[in-house]
A protein has these predicted regions:
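Short, well-formed alpha-helical segments that are part of the catalytic scaffolds
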Residues: 10-28
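Acidic helix N-cap motif at the loop->helix transition within catalytic regions
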Residues: 17-20, 41-50, 94
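A conserved acidic beta->alpha catalytic loop
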Residues: 25, 35-48, 59, 86-89
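Conserved donor nucleotide-binding strand/loop of the catalytic core
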Residues: 44-74
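Catalytic-site signature of metal-activated, phosphate-bearing donor transferases
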Residues: 65-73, 82, 91-216, 381
Length: 384
């Protein structure tokens, strides 16, 4: 046993295929508690075989906060640190040692790096800070979906960053998310003044193609006095632009994207979206300008709103095309070469680079021929 008593707790349903991998990862804890909410496979049996304490509850109507709170209720009262975890998430080895090295009794919760998604080459794609590690007393989960930990303890709520602690997400692609929308609508009904809930609901409407509802909800979010996080406001404006683009209102989309840039000029995402809009409208000066501005930003924000595409080959690809159209062929070659280096298996990028190089060589050759002709002509007719 280490410096602190650490208990991992989770909720599950029909995740038998993840049990062994997950139990291997959380085995560094002193105790593992799992609430099974209705599995019809061998999830519960396998967890027990691996040493977890498994409890069963039927939750109707379903809410994620209710499920997580019931799971937390089974955590021993003498636990020093609670680690909320899902079975499709995997801690990297040595997480306990890193957590104990950073934790002090004065802290109420811990923040660490979460890998949400991966690139095609299996390198981390989308990463941001997560904080689902907390002390035993004073916490409850709130909101039916996109639930968060609410603190009600007497001493200050203090968070520690745990350097080197990484949690990796390996989701089940077959798992449905259809239940999210009605739960978000319920959450908005229960919390009408919560800007975070309004933002998530507006985004979910966009995901479902419910464009008018998304537009109305996101505009409502932007008017909320508590909606002050500039990066999230920028994202709401980007989502509004996506909805308007889908409705064919390109000028309206551009207006919101320029507002998004002004709202949070330190993130790449609105510049990329404006560049993509310019590409669809053949507005090559706009594309070029947005690419140039975006690439001046060299540090990711670290928030969950980060879009991997803004840090991949897309900006260089768009820059190459815009420069080609603007007859800036040398710059086009440079952008195209960088794009291909970032995505070496992309046949389209390879063909684009070949075409751009061919044009660049042709222009240089023609320029050289004209220069030679000018020199010859100068000697024959005496003109300057």
């Amino acid at each position: 046993m280490g410096k602190y008593k650490i208990c991992v707790y989770a909720i599950t349903k029909n995740e038998e295929k993840f049990v062994d991998r997950w139990m291997d990862a959380v085995s560094e804890a002193d105790e593992v508690v799992v609430l099974d909410t209705g599995s019809t496979d061998r999830t519960a049996e396998k967890l027990r075989e691996r040493g977890a304490k498994v409890y069963k509850e039927k939750i109707d109507p379903w809410r994620f906060d209710t499920a997580r709170n019931l799971a937390m209720d089974h955590v021993p009262e003498d636990a020093d640190i609670c680690v909320s975890n899902d079975l499709d998430e995997v801690f990297e080895k040595g997480w306990r040692e890193k957590l104990e090295a950073a934790w002090q009794p004065c802290f109420t919760r811990a923040r660490y790096l979460f890998t949400y998604a991966y690139n095609s080459d299996s390198t981390p794609g989308k990463q941001f800070a997560m904080e689902k590690i907390h002390r035993r007393k004073g916490f409850r989960w709130v909101h039916p979906v996109h639930e968060v930990l609410a603190y009600s303890g007497e001493d200050p709520d203090r968070t520690v960053w745990v350097e080197g602690l990484v949690l990796n997400h390996h989701p089940d692609p077959e798992k449905p998310r259809a239940q999210y929308l009605p739960l978000l609508e319920l959450s908005a009904e229960e919390n009408p003044d919560d800007d975070r809930v309004a933002f998530w609901l507006g985004r979910e409407y966009m995901f479902h193609g419910m464009l008018d509802k998304s537009i109305d909800t996101l505009k409502k979010y932007l008017k909320m006095p508590s909606a002050v996080w500039t990066e999230e406001r920028c994202a709401a404006m980007r989502f509004l632009a996506k909805c308007l683009t889908a409705k064919g209102d390109f000028s309206g989309a551009a207006e919101w994207l320029f507002r998004a840039v002004a709202e949070c000029p330190t993130v790449r995402e609105p510049y990329l979206q404006l560049a993509m809009l310019g590409y669809t409208r053949n507005d090559w000066p706009l594309v070029f300008c947005m690419v140039e501005q975006a690439l001046k930003i060299t540090q990711k924000s670290g928030s969950y709103l980060f879009e991997p595409e803004a840090w991949g080959f897309s900006l260089y690809d768009l820059g190459a095309i815009a420069c080609y159209r603007l007859e800036l062929y040398q710059k086009s070659v440079e952008y195209a070469e960088t794009a291909l280096k970032m995505s070496p298996g992309d046949g389209r990028l390879q063909k684009n680079l070949e075409l751009i190089r061919e044009k660049y060589d042709e222009v240089r050759q023609n320029s050289g021929d004209k220069a030679k002709g000018s020199e010859t002509g100068g000697e024959s007719d005496g003109k300057v």
